[in-house]
Amino acid sequence: MNTHPTATLHMASGSKIVIELLPEAAPNTVNSFIYAASRGFMDHHAIQRIVPGNWVDVTYQAFGHKECQYLIPNEFELHPEIEPLDSHPGCVCMGGYGEDGLASCEFFFPLRDCPDHKGIYPVFGKVIEGMDEIWRLEKVKTRPVDFPIPGVEVNEPVEPEVIEKVELDLKGQTYLEPIRMKVQNLPPCWTDMR
């Protein structure tokens, strides 16, 4: 029997994306995702960034909640014994800000194999239902958005693509609050939230 927790993203389009979370692959990252999702911080959120051929980036502003405005250590710092998973379509990865740490809950769906992401943007889940919705999102019409980090391409959907609700099934397990970075250089894309 599979005891992995799942997260179901109910989309305003009527579709759903079901993610199997992988706590043995990225324990603290899974804890951080569950922390945000269980408090409703991801609900009613419009997807903020789509880069066709690369990824669907759900948010780059901590879902607009100051409670999600924290960084977590890279998994290899907490769990050097865990071999990171390869990043490819069908995976769910956590974004990050280089040496400053991983984003608290800013996850993305890769649209191609990303060998350069291994060990940097941890794979913490896999899509078990709804890849067709992710491929649909790749093709929606987008417009460019000014972004405060040089060299980062940001295009948002012209028509909002909204996650209405994230439904968790923790399979009766309890998950701890995430370990957070003690000293934080917060990303410039969070500036307008301070």
Located regions from the model:
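Cyclophilin-like peptidyl-prolyl cis-trans isomerases
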Residues: 1-194
